[in-house]
Amino acid sequence: MLKKDMNIADYDPELFKAIQNETLRQEEHIELIASENYTSPRVMEAQGSQLTNKYAEGYPGKRYYGGCEYVDVVETLAIERAKELFSATYANVQPHSGSQANSAVYMALLKPGDTVLGMNLAHGGHLTHGSPVNFSGKLYNIIPYGIDESGKIDYDEMERLAVEHKPKMMIGGFSAYSGIVDWAKMREIADKIGAYLFVDMAHVAGLIAAGVYPNPVPHAHVVTSTTHKTLAGPRGGVILSAADDEDLYKKLNSAVFPGGQGGPLMHVIAGKAVAFKEALEPEFKVYQQQVVNNAKAMVEVFLERGYKIVSGGTSNHLMLVDLIGRDLTGKEADAALGSANITVNKNSVPNDPRSPFVTSGVRIGTPAITRRGFKEAESKELTGWICDILDDANNPAVIERVKGQVLALCARFPVYG
């Protein structure tokens, strides 16, 4: 028999300890991985609800199982809020992840072997935009575009490649690009060759929702996103469109279910509904503007300390520190900073001579620290500590000093106060 007082601590202390340790790690480490964030207790409450028990294959009003009247309400709330948030006329909130949302778009719009123009992973793209190790690179003919010497997307090259190869689909979006993307220009190029424009806005969805980064939804045929990252919701995906094309919407729905998934995760969809409501609040706009302000403040200190930033700055939530020419790899920088309770990720940079497992760069993002309450002053102070370690990565005394400073700062700004 199930009882309400059942708990993990009594039943599975080994697992409980791991959960507690992760909670402590999050409180005592400064999180600078650009794709990570802290979701609200309301989102976690939704994910821990009895909605997890309900199978709901299909879509609201068209389910394959009975007893779906209340999960229909939940999913409809999520759909309508997503549409309002991004000025869309269509939303599918069922994808379990951003990658599965992307997979559904490929399935809906393309046939295996079709040509796709996507951003080079080494220049800031994403695995699902055509990497040879990903389904996208294995099933489709991928033509990569990249950035120019200034670190900005090369639209002239993009147009030349599009005209030459005539892809059926062009992909906008990135995982490590700090500039503003000209969605209108991309649509102009796509229209010139009769291609679909698909935008993966996963990294900047929160900024877009808040109006501090251009919205691709009015320009693209279809847009996907994760619901975590800057959006600060549960881990999951969403597909959006404002194309006013019912045939396209049907293809997208069919590609998600039954094409790629079975039953939706209703407890996660409830979490998405909560997160979308939170993103519609005025304070969310203040938060996202601060995310950008903090990123710019960090770049300022890196440049003052003599570090190179790919593209020379940032217009969003992330920056890529280029370590080419320094006696320090991205992997070594990642490890040294981690020893001081500062979490980043090694990342390839343009023209990187090192392997993707070693790299010559570090990717840094500000969504999580801003969620804790950091402003420009704390962001600059933190960047100084990072530079201290990068300047002397093999010095245990420097690492220990910075670790102490990090712990004190974390105590001042708890994740969940």
Swiss-Prot record:
GO terms for biological process: glycine biosynthetic process from serine; tetrahydrofolate interconversion. The modification N6-(pyridoxal phosphate)lysine is found at K229. Pathway: One-carbon metabolism; tetrahydrofolate interconversion; Amino-acid biosynthesis; glycine biosynthesis; glycine from L-serine: step 1/1. InterPro entries: PyrdxlP-dep_Trfase, PyrdxlP-dep_Trfase_major, PyrdxlP-dep_Trfase_small, Ser_HO-MeTrfase, Ser_HO-MeTrfase-like, Ser_HO-MeTrfase_PLP_BS, SHMT-like_dom. Its EC number is 2.1.2.1. Its main location: cytoplasm. GO terms for cellular component: cytosol. SUPFAM superfamilies: PLP-dependent transferases. Its cofactor is pyridoxal 5'-phosphate. Keywords: Amino-acid biosynthesis, Cytoplasm, One-carbon metabolism, Pyridoxal phosphate, Transferase. HAMAP family: SHMT. Catalyzes the reversible interconversion of serine and glycine with tetrahydrofolate (THF) serving as the one-carbon carrier. This reaction serves as the major source of one-carbon groups required for the biosynthesis of purines, thymidylate, methionine, and other important biomolecules. Also exhibits THF-independent aldolase activity toward beta-hydroxyamino acids, producing glycine and aldehydes, via a retro-aldol mechanism. Homodimer. This is Serine hydroxymethyltransferase. It comes from Shewanella baltica (strain OS185). The gene is glyA.
